[in-house]
Amino acid sequence: MKKYQQLAEQLREQIASGIWQPGDRLPSLRDQVALSGMSFMTVSHAYQLLESQGYIIARPQSGYYVAPQAIKMPKAPVIPVTRDEAVDINTYIFDMLQASRDPSVVPFASAFPDPRLFPLQQLNRSLAQVSKTATAMSVIENLPPGNAELRQAIARRYALQGITISPDEIVITAGALEALNLSLQAVTEPGDWVIVENPCFYGALQALERLRLKALSVATDVKEGIDLQALELALQEYPVKACWLMTNSQNPLGFTLTPQKKAQLVALLNQYNVTLIEDDVYSELYFGREKPLPAKAWDRHDGVLHCSSFSKCLVPGFRIGWVAAGKHARKIQRLQLMSTLSTSSPMQLALVDYLSTRRYDAHLRRLRRQLAERKQRAWQALLRYLPAEVKIHHNDSGYFLWLELPEPLDAGELSLAALTHHISIAPGKMFSTGENWSRFFRFNTAWQWGEREEQAVKQLGKLIQERL
């Protein structure tokens, strides 16, 4: 158990025994450092863990307090990735999120594209327009499964790819992450086994931990994607209930599965009666002539829950996503009503208004062109300034590059050193519970390139060279 986990466990026991009562203010981070003798970062991570588990709450400018229901809560177990490994990615996630909030830090670690790429003025006009015409009934009309016009517009976009999905099968959510979490809840129970890629989007690992599910990480190649032979071995050995994968522009590696492999994947999971939860948030960010099909296109047995959003291609702040849920649509609606209740009504209406202008596809074409140009420029800068021993894995979609450091360098240590120079990168351990990706890091190429970015890459090259 890590030090921050030990401290969190100690505080949990104190809360359970009544030493700290609901509503009590906990010692400040600095006071806890003095009391425990641990580092500021360790204490921060312990408090973050307790907050994520619902034991404490943070109040701005005030501190941390014991949550009202904390004493009644059962202890939340850590989840094994194998029989003897536990998820431990909070340190890296915390550092990345903290760094991304600081405008002085070059955000190569960010998961989002540059917001200046989005048509914010047009979207704001749409939001202003619907604010004038919204009625009291608008809130009711936009309760789960969501705005009917928006669901119809999404269904039409599926139809453009030859995929028939009824608007009644679509549930609008507060971003793709809610769609993915609700999908996971709909098909699993605590203690079930779920397959994820290795490496995978860190939100998947957090979701499994929160829902008390067991994770099986399956080997995933930087170009070819998930190893289907390894996947079948896992399906044979464990009673797997769901499989959470990205098939297009995978985060963090960047690959897109071939049509043949998508078909094989769907057939294999159907053979073992395992639901595929398809995370497809980057599907619009392709650089080729045709949009890649999701695995959902090969689904003939209603075994794929296809999740996506407008966050990575249109507007992150609106937090509008969806799941094509098929037979699980009503259950997902019920789960949503018990959690977030519904997705923002004004945001749904504004998106319907914007999509009605038919500017969306023109925006997407422009966005893809700009992302491709920026990715090429960043790649060239990395080739120019980084030592030749560093391998740069490049895929023709999305806005991530996956970099491999030579042995014995550690990307986690490099990321901390880079932060002292106001540069953020996303270390490989953020995306896995094991140590096999410790020499890798993800690099965001979507931000506008200028002298600051050029100098940041140059400094990154110096830091790597010093460690060779």
UniProtKB/Swiss-Prot annotation:
It holds the Pfam family Aminotran_1_2. Disulfide bonds: none annotated. Residues 1-69 form the HTH gntR-type domain. The modification N6-(pyridoxal phosphate)lysine is found at K312. Gene3D superfamilies: Aspartate Aminotransferase, domain 1, Type I PLP-dependent aspartate aminotransferase-like (Major domain), Winged helix-like DNA-binding domain superfamily/Winged helix DNA-binding domain. GO terms for biological process: alpha-amino acid metabolic process; biosynthetic process. Keywords: Aminotransferase, DNA-binding, Pyridoxal phosphate, Transcription, Transcription regulation, Transferase. GO terms for molecular function: DNA binding; DNA-binding transcription factor activity; pyridoxal phosphate binding; transaminase activity. Transmembrane segments: none annotated. This is Uncharacterized HTH-type transcriptional regulator YdcR. It comes from Escherichia coli (strain K12).
